[in-house]
Regions:
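Conserved N-terminal Rossmann-fold NAD(P)-binding element of oxidoreductases
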Residues: 3-7
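N-terminal Rossmann-fold NAD(P) dinucleotide-binding loop
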Residues: 12-13, 74
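Aromatic pocket-lining residues of Rossmann-like dinucleotide-binding sites
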Residues: 19
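NAD(P)-binding Rossmann-fold cofactor-contacting core
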Residues: 24-42
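Short acidic low-complexity segments
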Residues: 50-61
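Beta-loop-alpha module in the N-terminal Rossmann-like domain of NAD(P)-dependent dehydrogenases
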Residues: 62-83, 95-97
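Rossmann-fold NAD(P)-binding glycine/threonine-rich loop
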Residues: 92-115
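C-terminal catalytic/substrate-binding lobe primarily of soluble NAD(P)-dependent oxidoreductases
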Residues: 135-255
């Protein structure tokens, strides 16, 4: 199988390495618009990878497309993949982008094109854990997601902006709108993370979980934040995020 990975950042580079660890993928096309980033990443990849310094939306010769460009830039590529009937995987954790892509679910179904959303940390791992937990119970009424940490610079930027935007919780057959940065909740994560104050934010997890579990009456998601995080959320980031993201954890609570 020939797979195209668009984006050679912290997430895209790791996706490429993970795909190389198996035998089902015969070739990977790793594409990015940043030549320096591609040169750095290519040093740790083998001869099954073709490095392309090209625009993301230009023609691709691949059976499956993995879109690992920064959140907020993925929608046009996903729609192009649907149009050309190519299976596509999106790593976006942007609420607006996730909702936008979901609007084309009917077109994807008509084109018989698989489109996979929520493939990161949260949403992604949290959705898998929620699905696993739901299977243990006869009936589930609540799912609550909490997250600490980011996967890289673009993920950190989404996290930063989300704290200043409207959050959406699913509650009793309606979407409840609440200000980002509100709703403090002390959440306990595995060590070495430990307890963290978590707050509402514009997160995609409730939307995807509602689509997966429409019978659940209350679905929420929160992210960890300090006082400075909440106060500076409407402003540009004051300091550059760590290139590798650092430690992180997720918590999935089911009732």
């Amino acid at each position: 199988m020939r797979v195209a990975v668009l984006g050679a950042g912290a997430v895209g580079a790791r996706i490429a390495r993970q795909l190389l660890s198996g035998t089902s993928v015969t070739q990977i096309i790793l594409r990015d618009t940043d030549a320096d980033r591609l040169a750095q990443v290519s040093k740790s990849l083998g001869d099954r990878v073709i490095i392309e310094h090209a625009p993301f939306n230009s023609q691709l010769d691949a059976e499956v497309i993995v879109v690992a460009t920064p959140s907020g830039t993925q929608m046009s590529t996903v729609l192009e993949a649907i149009e050309h009937r190519r299976p596509v995987i999106s790593t976006s954790d942007s609420l607006a982008e996730t909702v936008g892509i979901l609007k084309f679910s009917k077109q994807a179904e008509e084109n018989n094109t698989p489109v996979i959303l929520g493939t990161g940390f949260a949403p992604g791992l949290t959705c898998v854990l929620a699905s696993h937990g739901v299977a243990w119970f006869d009936k589930v009424e609540e799912i609550h997601i909490s997250k600490v940490g980011t996967g890289g610079p673009s993920c950190a930027l989404v996290h930063h902006r989300a704290l200043s935007r409207i959050s959406y919780d699913w509650r009793h057959d309606n979407w409840a709108r609440r200000p980002g940065g509100s709703g403090r909740s002390l959440c306990w994560f595995p060590e070495p993370i430990g307890p963290q104050d978590c707050y509402r934010a514009a997160l995609a997890s409730p939307v995807l979980l509602h689509h997966a579990f429409p019978e659940v009456s209350w679905i929420t998601a929160r992210v960890s934040a300090t006082l400075r995080d909440r106060l500076t959320a409407p402003l540009p980031m004051l300091s550059p995020p760590h290139s590798e993201g650092g430690l992180g954890a997720v918590r999935v609570e089911i009732h």
